[in-house]
Amino acid sequence: MKVAIIGATGYGGIELIRLLEQHPYFSIASLHSFSQVGECITNVYPHFQNVLVHTLQEIDVEEIEKEAEIVFLATPAGVSAELTPKLLAVGLKVIDLSGDFRMKDPFIYEQWYKRAAAKEGVLREAVYGLSEWKRSEIQKANLIANPGCFATAALLAILPLVRSGIIEEDSIIIDAKSGVSGAGKTPTTMTHFPELYDNLRIYKVNEHQHIPEIEQMLAEWNRETKPITFSTHLIPISRGIMVTLYAKVKREMEIEQLQQLYEEAYEQSAFIRIRMQGEFPSPKEVRGSNYCDMGIAYDERTGRVTIVSVIDNMMKGAAGQAIQNANIVAGLEETTGLQHMPLYL
């Protein structure tokens, strides 16, 4: 099956290229850029030399429709909202890595993203692409809104608790830390090496755009869920996310019950790895892979559950999950082309 990538020169775009070039079923028909049309991708990223030869093309929907069946959008917020209706109109399936179609309520999108929302008709058509929790809907979708990286790590960690109804609905606290690639390719003062090296920073306190995305998904599984407390930090690693999540249980639990809850929730999910009791993952253990690793603890003194969830923000948090969703759409095994062992070093 032929695919096209729009926004091929950003970090999400080049990770899609790396994965799709090794995929046994999908093949890249075309790469598209806004600012580097006519450049060979190997001139922009020499690490692709002798691996693929593609010239970056302008975005011509009619030409894309002739060559591809699925389009991956690795574009900034706002761009996908403009392009997607045109792509859908010619029968293309779209997997969007931006946040433009994650929120069903356009008012909430505009409140958090500070820009105009996509058309409501297209928003209604979009399926939120959290692969392990939306398989049947993804299978039939024409437009998939790939989840945000923080939202992916957090939701995979909390949804078994929310679905089971065993936690206090107003008790969810999420502390999240991300490598600097999560901030995107465009440099800022905060991501400048002297500012970040030997340092860490909290940012977007109570204002991160993944907050409503997480809350929307939690409400699908429990309408009583209250607003969450969510903080994000930038740490001096290139890729990786660690989420530490806390919630208070409604009644006394045994750690064995919680362990069983998670093992059963994800027993059919090849990319979710639950650690043995008392063990907790770190970002290095999933780097370069599509895995989400989790560890579980329960504090009898406070009645709080602690879940530690780690992903590679460029893989399970972006390009990897996008291809997992494409596999579902195409009727393939979810693991097709994604069976990469983590790069520990």
From Swiss-Prot:
One of its GO terms (cellular component) is cytoplasm. InterPro entries: AGPR_AS (IPR023013), AGPR_type-1 (IPR000706), NAD(P)-bd_dom_sf (IPR036291), NAGSA_dehydrogenase (IPR050085), Semialdehyde_DH_NAD-bd (IPR000534). It is an enzyme of class 1 (oxidoreductase). It is found in: Cytoplasm. One of its GO terms (molecular function) is NAD binding. Its EC number is 1.2.1.38. Keywords: Amino-acid biosynthesis, Arginine biosynthesis, Cytoplasm, NADP, Oxidoreductase. GO terms for biological process: L-arginine biosynthetic process. Its main location: cytoplasm. The active site is at residue 149. Pathway: Amino-acid biosynthesis; L-arginine biosynthesis; N(2)-acetyl-L-ornithine from L-glutamate: step 3/4. It catalyses: N-acetyl-L-glutamate 5-semialdehyde + phosphate + NADP(+) = N-acetyl-L-glutamyl 5-phosphate + NADPH + H(+). The keyword Cytoplasm applies. Belongs to the NAGSA dehydrogenase family. Type 1 subfamily. Catalyzes the NADPH-dependent reduction of N-acetyl-5-glutamyl phosphate to yield N-acetyl-L-glutamate 5-semialdehyde. This is N-acetyl-gamma-glutamyl-phosphate reductase. The lineage of its organism: Bacteria, Bacillati, Bacillota, Bacilli, Bacillales. The gene is argC.
